[in-house]
Design a protein with these regions (language model features):
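A short, N-terminal "cap"/entry segment at the start of jelly-roll beta-barrel domains
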Residues: 1-29, 38
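Short, conserved beta-strand element in jelly-roll/cupin
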Residues: 41-56
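A cytosolic small-molecule/anion-sensing beta-strand core signal
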Residues: 51-52, 68, 86
Length: 96
């Protein structure tokens, strides 16, 4: 799990950056307060870039709080979970 504090919170800039890095299946997602995703994996490398709110992400190595402007890169097949208490909006992308 790699986290970068980019300071970028503009959706359009985030999407263009991910496109330039070869990510596809790029979309915007928002979760309401109290949303929880149990342990799961993704087949491909994944990115989650928060532009509003905050989310807690956990792996077998621990957990982190992602806030506005934070980018999380997850290698393919990384077992993880996520929850938000306040609500969050982020840009998602995948790379094969």
């Amino acid at each position: 799990m790699k986290i970068k504090k980019t300071g970028i919170t503009n959706k359009e800039k985030i999407i263009k950056k991910l496109e330039s890095e070869g990510f596809d299946n790029i979309f915007v997602w928002c979760d309401n307060p109290g949303t929880f995703y149990d342990w799961h994996t993704h087949q491909y490398q994944e990115v989650r870039w928060v532009y509003k709110g905050e989310i807690i992400m956990g792996t077998e190595d621990g957990e982190v709080i992602l806030t506005e402007g934070d980018r999380l890169d997850l290698p393919a097949n990384t077992k993880h979970w996520a929850k938000t208490q306040r609500g969050v909006c982020y840009v998602c992308g995948s790379k094969k």
